[in-house]
Each structure stands twice: as structure tokens, then as C-alpha cells.
Amino acid sequence: AFAAAAQAERGSDGEVRIIYWQAPSILNPYLSSGTKDLESASLALEPLARFDETGTMVPLLVDELPTVDNGGVSEDLTRITWKLTPGILWSDGTPLTSADVKFTADYCMHPEGGCAQNPKFENVASIETPDAQTVVINFDKPTPYPYAMFVGGETPILQQAQFQDCVGAKAPECTEANFNPIGTGPFVVTEFRPNDVITFEANQNYRDPSKPAFAKVLFKGGGDATAAGRAVMETGEYDYAWNLQLAPDVIAGMEAAGKGKAVAGFGPLMERIMLNNTNPDPALGPDERSVIRPHPFLSDPAVYKAMSLAIDRPLLVEIGYGKAGRVTCNWVPAPATYDSDTFDCSTQDIAGANKMLDDAGIVDTDGDGIREKDGVPLKILYQTSTNAVRQDFQALIKQWWSEIGIESELRNINASVFFGGDPGSPDTFQKFYADVEMYSNTFNGTDPQAYLGNALCDDAPRPDTQWQGQNVARFCSEEYDALHQELTQTANLEERARIAKALNDMVIEQGGMIPLVHRGRISAHANDLGGVKLNVWDSEIWAIADWHRIKE
């Protein structure tokens, strides 16, 4: 305890240097949705609560999170009451009050404001401030997840005194305020040069007198991911580098220099093979192709389960992602609360896959090496976007599937076309003119309700939706739709997690997709920088108040 106390002195560790290869342009999260801007602003501006590195909501400017159980959320889910922790000061020494919180909401909801975070303030009917520490937000309908606003770095509290003349159309004109926001966070902006560099110093009014350990932050922007990685891991010029989208061997080479290490953070991003639940036969007309159910053989559980069993996921992770990948069997691999433990897919089993197909009577009757189901050969068109890692995956998976009597034709499509959504193109992932297709998807925040809505029957792309819709597999289950409806009406977080896992399991078990790799985001920090906890649910550098220099 004595050693910790001796170290615990604000500003005692000097300067910390951060490099983001995308440079910040503004420090007001309500006027930008760029990660670089939101995260640099998070050193000064804070929300009422935030998400920790596991995706768990934790209080920040309040003592407890409002819930139905503690009376903070009304039984009918139309009201949430936040109680500010007493005694919190802005960096200019004035008190934080409920008026600042109400002002921030009004600032974003102003019809002429063009607020980047507007969707987070949906369904707000009114906001009351019965006293200086209490904020009551009333919704115009039951809202089981009332934490969209003021939770996380995208919706922090602005100081009313600083921004009161910057409302509506005037918001972007308030350069001084937008570049130098007064906050409650561990640091204060001392100079901001847009698209170049920001300097911060420790907030002398920060609520924890022993933090931050660093007196100054140099926040440099620009360059590219390679240069940023080198600046931390090879030259040691910087202490922290963000979002290193580099191949595993490149990162390993940088780490070998011995100055720093790469760290991976895992949100919900997941590489998967989607299974077409409809028939993509080119012989069908445009109103039926990839519209009518079922698929001639992919609808058979023996087929899609054998296809999954034949895949060596640990090898895919090693080849494609290194430490930025993990094996997953789930559509929703994170946050941990929602990660189902029903399936194990970490071991390839070619023999087991062959037996599964044999037992189902799906055998090769004509000796050409390809099995048939009801006379239809198991020949599949397997498409994805053009990308070196994806083509490696296709080649391996084609080989493994051939070992269980399934023949694949590989196709790769330019990413801008594949993901482009042009209803006139036959090559989009939504149109899905193939049997299986591979890509990644993810969702924002930590609540998967809307994401799980991507398997609802009526969300399938088809001609009368102009081929738009998120249910690309054309999965359809009345039981699933009913359970998802139940999720939208459930407030208890544990119960939401139980239902979400059940929905995840239904889509995997009933052949909506074959999950492959849970993908991460990589950053790097100096070996002597302590307290770093990479966060993919909130500002990545959310824990900077706890950063410190590790003493030799």
C-alpha cells in the first residue's frame, strides 16, 4: 500500500505521447462521428456512464446506474433518472450540474443543429431537472434500453456556460469551444492544431487527486498505420499507436525490435460464411432466384453441420489474423454477456463430417467424388470480396469441403461492388446469387437487439425491397421472430442476455450461417506504459486517467 501511495501523485510521470494515423479535426463529439475525433475528445469530455473493456456499463459521473430494480428506471420503461455524484467540478472549477446534462440533450436535439449523435436521443419527450444533481429523461414510449444517450464517449456532457451561445445553426461556428471544450475528464486542452497535433495537461480539478499520473499528453495525428506502429514498437518515439490495420507478420516484425507490444481488442466483428436458405439456381427467373425457399440441399442440417465440422478454424485464425483473431462459433461473439457457450467448433473433424453425411443418406451414388441429396449433387458457388486473406480462406475451405464430397466453385468480387448495394447488380452480397458467401459484420454499442433483428423473416432482401434488407441468408423462423419480439419488450439485462443467446443459437443450429473468426482491433503501446486496457465498446483510450509509466 505504501508503494502505491508513494507513486500516486498527479502529474508525476511527465509526458505521454499518442499517435493516431487519422488526425483529429474537432473536439466536439456532437459535430463529428469520426473515431479519431471522439477518442481525442474523451480525454477532456465525459459521459454519465461508460462501457469498460468487457462491454459492461460502469458509472462515471454518477454513483450508480439507474435500473428498474433500484427505481432509476420506471416500471413502464418510459423514464430514467440519473443522480450526479456530488462535488464534481468542471476543469474551470465550476460545479457540474443537472442543467449541463439537460443543456447537452437540448443542444443535440435542436432541429437546426445537425447533431452527429441524433439517433441516440430518439424518443425523448422531455427532460426535467428537479434539483442540481437530478436529471429525469422522459420517453414518448416504453424504452427497454434507455442508455443510448450519455453512456459512452459519443455522447458526453458539454458545459452549458461554454456552449449556450452555440446552439442550432451556430454550433459549427463556435470554433473556440469546439476546439477547446471544458470538461470533467482527466486532461484539459492547452492547444489544438486541427489535423495535426493536440497538447493536453492534467486537469487540476479532476475528482481523483492522485490522477492522472501524466502531467501532459502530446496527441499527434497523421501518417499511416505502418509509420505509427514503427513509432511505438521500433523507434520508441511514441507511447501509444491506434488501430494498426497491418498483417500479423508485419506487426510481429515491429514487436521484435523490443520497444513495445501490440494489443488486440475484440468487439462483435465476426467473419462468417452465410448460407443461402433460398434457391439461387440461375435457371429461375429474377422474381424467384434467391427468393423461393428452400435451398435444394443447404436446408438439410446434416449438410451445413458437416460443412462447419470440416473447417479448421484455428488454422484460419493463424493464417489470416494472428493475435487479432479468435475462433468463434457464434453470430454474436461479444460482449461476453451475450457470447453463447452452446457450441464448440474449435476442432476440425473430417471423419465426423463424412459420417454425418453418410448417416443422413447423402452419398456419392455415381462415383464422381461428389455426394448427392435427392439426386442433386452437392456443388456450391462460394463467393466473397476480393481480399488476400479471404482468397486464402476460400482455397483452404474448398479443399476441406472436397474431402467430404462437396465441390466448390470460388468467386471473388470487387469489394465496392459486392458491398455496394446496387439493386441492378447481380454481384451484391444482398442479392446473394450464390450458395454461400463470406464476409464480416458487426454492430455498435453493446446491445445486440437491432443486430439480431437481421434474421427476421421480413428483413430478407427481395425484388419488392429493391434487394435491400439485412437478412442476407433469407433465414426465416416464426419461433425466432416471436422470441425477438419478446427481446424488444424485455428490460432486465440478465433476461435480455438469455434471450439474445437463444436467438444466436437458433440461427446457428437452423443453418443461417457458419461463424469462422472473431476479429479484433490492434493497437500498440510502449513496454513501460502501464494501465492500458484496450476498449472496443467505447473510446479506446477510455482508461487514460489510469495510465502511468512503469518504473524499472
Specify the residue positions occupied by each region the protein language model found.
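N-terminal lobe/hinge region of extracytoplasmic solute-binding protein
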Residues: 19-73, 106, 182-184
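Active-site-proximal polar cores
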Residues: 516
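Surface-exposed binding/hinge segments that line
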Residues: 117-167, 191-193
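Mature extracytoplasmic/periplasmic domains
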Residues: 166, 324-342, 522-524
